[in-house]
């Protein structure tokens, strides 16, 4: 497909005054030369008219020379140009120099076209001479009336359409191709593949076009002419991305003030400005955004919508990527699940089934049982498996890797996907590959081994077999297996034991038939790891996939995962998302190019045109300067986080599980009704709470948010709801800390007035808040109000960015991991212990791993390390006392416990001897922080726990 567009070259800026002064003598010589040449041309016709025999004498030798050149033998031909060609080239060069000089003298004059279609002034005589020797060329209807002065040698693609067979022109359209009425979208094409000469790139199905404009730039045509490509794309606004990419965000930045990486200045990429709707062209390490107008035509081996571009970049910091039409790169391991037989069956292709990725074919309905001689081998296999179990160390650190999920193949929401997580990987390593380690004769009977493996898997204890549930499919109406990694369909009813290929991993929402142990539930999935910036550099982004990966690994190292019920997540449906967010917000951030094919094209076209992204300094794309966006994976990860928290909350509310911890990302408590900000797209905790309300699973719900940033999205969602009590402990600094909301006087509205409690810490980091301040807030404000509210379920936005180890822009507080564990224990005294923690913020890997470990240990009821003596005995700082006093004063008219504290201020802060006059007056006015009065409101069985020394 020829994509050349007649476009004028960019006008060069006027030279500097110093250069003009140096060029004046040269211009004068040029003007004199041109004047003499024009005078000579004007005198030449007069000489020809006065002396007619002279042209004949002059033409004679030229005519004879031309005849000799035309009739020269092939063996005598050379590359030396004739005098006529030299003269013609000299005239063309002279004319170009004259045009360049005129543009320099008059910079504001309109530029000349890229190629002059009119004949040159001096070619009339030459054409008359050559017309008698050169045969006439038949003209085509599409040719201009005059031939080009200099025809390019590589011009075959210009004539490609003329000789295209009529049969290919009349071929019907492939049903798998994108509909013409579908909204326009983008295709990300990695720049490395354009210039790569490796075999992997040379065999790419989508090889691009071979027009002269592309081939004239060498081996890397697109990267060598970024400006020209940008001008071409600007002329095709109907097919460019339906969103603009501003460079400045109007939303507040959560990372404002963070120091840039050391190498930020050295490798920062520069992007030419191409207008408000222009594409973004990056460096050789930045993917290019190409519209569908530049995609190869259909009719190849694969439809243009399904032609991948495989990129193997060993020098990059990220994993190998697979780029498909869209904006985001795919990890290489997802390529196998994307190119499934089911998706390519409509194109008429028959790909052979790879035996390395598929499993053995299931037996027929009349398959006989294993023969008798195989019994000794089965016993030997059983012994070998037991030896492997005994040799495995529970404290050994597992190897974390991203396992491909079939969830990405689900383009509509709601149903749980066939996703494999790290827990399943552990199971497969222990029970899916014993034949590779056993004796050689056993490898000849894979079917028998699969039967034995499944029989052994049913006998192994729950904690040692992994974190997911493998159940054979029931006979009858079962859900069909995903075709991503399974072999061809098997008969519905089998008399023989079902092999492992007929076992599927059930998500947490599909396991109600199995009785879950009444313990702590953990939820995690590798789908959420794919939400990454296209730059591949995690050091530039505080919120990255390594956060949940590190937490999941820490829980495995400490043996906590084996004590919990590890569940599978699911993707939240669009209807569930719309219970909190607007339809526009859900369609913008809850769909990807694959899932949009099943939605209303007319509605999507208008919404996508309103979507705005920003260009990040790293070269990626984001909703704002903090929140990165990956067109293929961000929507799936955000929906998976929301669905996982919702599913875990339902299991705890129905008492299938005692409590739970959701290791999810991206976070959600900053996402409000129609805005994504602060790393958040969908408010997972708010969605779970709303779903519990709509399905009458809980009448009163308490949401505690101890993230150092205020949960503005959660507060906005339930600001007028009296059935949801929202309590937030956050750094406020009088509105000068992100996101700026969460003041003490924000207490709710309407019927929900008083059900919004903000413990807004003030005073900055002089000194920073720590364990004494958070313990005082929990004992003075959080727990008394929560007991008076008496919730049925407790949801916790468990952000750990208040933990020690975070820089000042991301928190700067010094809360210990033991304090987070203690606060979790306190919340378990509410709602019968029905507590669900969902990971929110926290970006220091060591801090969030320690805090998560302490919280999970508290949920399990294990012995938590006691707080330090300093944390118990040290009194809160003056800024914290003032903040707590403000909360008591504001909420004294809504809660009885706060009213009693406000009426007796002298009873909860003792006098501090030896303090200066100002501090003594403040402390005397604010009263004591003793917990003696609080003991009157607590049940008798809790007095023993509260009698710990609290000399604050």
Swiss-Prot record:
Residues 1-268 are annotated as: Transcription repression 1. This is Histone deacetylase 7. The lineage of its organism: Eukaryota, Metazoa, Chordata, Craniata, Vertebrata. Responsible for the deacetylation of lysine residues on the N-terminal part of the core histones (H2A, H2B, H3 and H4). Histone deacetylation gives a tag for epigenetic repression and plays an important role in transcriptional regulation, cell cycle progression and developmental events. Histone deacetylases act via the formation of large multiprotein complexes. Involved in muscle maturation by repressing transcription of myocyte enhancer factors such as MEF2A, MEF2B and MEF2C. During muscle differentiation, it shuttles into the cytoplasm, allowing the expression of myocyte enhancer factors. It catalyses: N(6)-acetyl-L-lysyl-[histone] + H2O = L-lysyl-[histone] + acetate; N(6)-acetyl-L-lysyl-[protein] + H2O = L-lysyl-[protein] + acetate. The keyword ATP-binding does not apply. Residues 360-374 have a biased composition (Pro residues). Residues 130-224, 261-283, 349-377, 389-441, 460-510 are annotated as: Disordered. It comes from Homo sapiens (Human). It is found in: Nucleus; Cytoplasm. Residues 877-952 are annotated as: Interaction with SIN3A. Residues 49-149 are annotated as: Interaction with MEF2A. The gene is HDAC7.
